[in-house]
Amino acid sequence: MSTDKTQVKLRFFTREEDETLHVNDAPIYAPVSLKRYGLSEIVNHLLELPKSMPFDFLIDGELLRTSLQDYLIKKGLSSETFLNVEYTRAVLPPSYLSSFDNEDWVSSLDVGSNYIYSGSYDGIVRTYNLSGKVEKQYSGHSGPIRAVHYISSTRLVSAGNDRTLRLWKTKNDDLKSIDEEEIEDGKTLAILEGHKAPVVSIDVSKDRILSASCDNTVSLWSTNYKEMTVIDPMEDLGGNVSTAAKKRRKLTLKDGSIRRRAPLALFESHSAPVEAVIFDKSDDTVGYSVSQDHTIKTWDLITAKCVDTKTTSYSLLSVAQLPKLNLLACGSSARHITLHDPRVNSSSKITQQQLVGHKNFVVALDTCPENEYMICSASHDGTVKVWDVRSNTAMYTITREDKNVVKGVNDKVFAVKWAKGVGIISGGQDKKIQINKGDNIFSN
């Protein structure tokens, strides 16, 4: 295989839903010297599109980043090999858009109602408008915040190292039927207590909240405090204490006047800290958690039972669901992302695929709102990577834009969110909320 005249037999196919992008699947011969651009020209010719469209190509699930000849050599294949070549619309690089300042490390991010919500190590939740202005701050946690999640235009939930979750009131609209009394905007509706160690992850589905903690447990809560059991902060004093002593205790107790609530259910099965938890996107009676005990657990949230455990070889630190593909993506302490089929009756093959490229812990994941095959990941190596899960290597790597970032000193990324209408939002040790392009990602 030496000359440019050498050809290889191949068949093009696509999984694009748009049928105008489907070619006839008859085999053709193409020069082995072709790279992505040349293959794109062939597909455009076959499609007879009015306007040329760039494509990416995958062979056996691997994105083609070289010539066909280099691919064949790398795989030890001859030019006699028949190649099935998948093509997809090319994805644009996630170009840098802007950065917002935060007062401390950014541990968590969410988006809702055209606002960005950040949880910070200074214990404050902040609401940013899309221009980067801080519109509101929520203070109450007594330690670093580890997770924040938008619930609705009137509700927000956060969790942190102080072992609690807090339900926040963001504004007064339509709340009179829910709340017993008017509470000022930006104030705590309820403190949710029950965990015995830092609460590091939360997810929300409709009126339910899941939390994961370093106490090895997962808890289920309601977004409406009336549904949860009241906790009396005086209860642990016992019945033989004078009224005066109780009054003194209440005065010294931080936030003593704020209502406190217990979880609807507590899930115990993990044997090490639980690092992340999510609801199933198509069935909110099912939850998934990942832990430093190397396992992925599936929970029946109705019966509070663990219905499936999948054991991997590494501590798991983050999780995201790709529902159309029946896959969970899990970030690990071993620097890679593993893909798993969470279904109880799925194949005995625990790990379906590994995505390799990060150089440190993979601590946050999110899915692309435009494409069921794409995810982004945040790592302590200082990068966010964009992946097509049909390939085991990253499509793009996003680095920190702040010039004050020193590699290995203050470049860890702790949080990433891929939000339609906003982009790929990330934050970490550099105290910046960085936004990269994440909308209209396909070339036209």
Swiss-Prot record:
InterPro entries: G-protein_beta_WD-40_rep (IPR020472), NLE (IPR012972), WD40/YVTN_repeat-like_dom_sf (IPR015943), WD40_repeat_CS (IPR019775), WD40_repeat_dom_sf (IPR036322), WD40_rpt (IPR001680), WDR12/Ytm1 (IPR028599). GO terms for biological process: maturation of 5.8S rRNA from tricistronic rRNA transcript (SSU-rRNA, 5.8S rRNA, LSU-rRNA); maturation of LSU-rRNA from tricistronic rRNA transcript (SSU-rRNA, 5.8S rRNA, LSU-rRNA). Disulfide bonds: none annotated. The keyword Nucleus applies. It is found in: Nucleus, Nucleolus; Nucleus, Nucleoplasm. SMART domains: WD40 (SM00320). Keywords: Nucleus, Repeat, Ribosome biogenesis, rRNA processing, WD repeat. It comes from the Eukaryota. Residues 99-444 are annotated as: Sufficient for interaction with ERB1 and association with 66S pre-ribosomes. One of its GO terms (molecular function) is ribonucleoprotein complex binding. WD repeats lie at residues 99-138, 140-178, 194-231, 269-309, 311-350, 357-397, 408-444. Residues 8-89 are annotated as: Ubiquitin-like (UBL) domain. Pfam families: NLE (PF08154), WD40 (PF00400). One of its GO terms (cellular component) is preribosome, large subunit precursor. The keyword Lyase does not apply. Belongs to the WD repeat WDR12/YTM1 family. Component of the NOP7 complex, composed of ERB1, NOP7 and YTM1. The complex is held together by ERB1, which interacts with NOP7 via its N-terminal domain and with YTM1 via a high-affinity interaction between the seven-bladed beta-propeller domains of the 2 proteins. The NOP7 complex associates with the 66S pre-ribosome. Interacts (via UBL domain) with MDN1 (via VWFA/MIDAS domain). Component of the NOP7 complex, which is required for maturation of the 25S and 5.8S ribosomal RNAs and formation of the 60S ribosome. This is Ribosome biogenesis protein YTM1. It comes from Kluyveromyces lactis (strain ATCC 8585 / CBS 2359 / DSM 70799 / NBRC 1267 / NRRL Y-1140 / WM37).
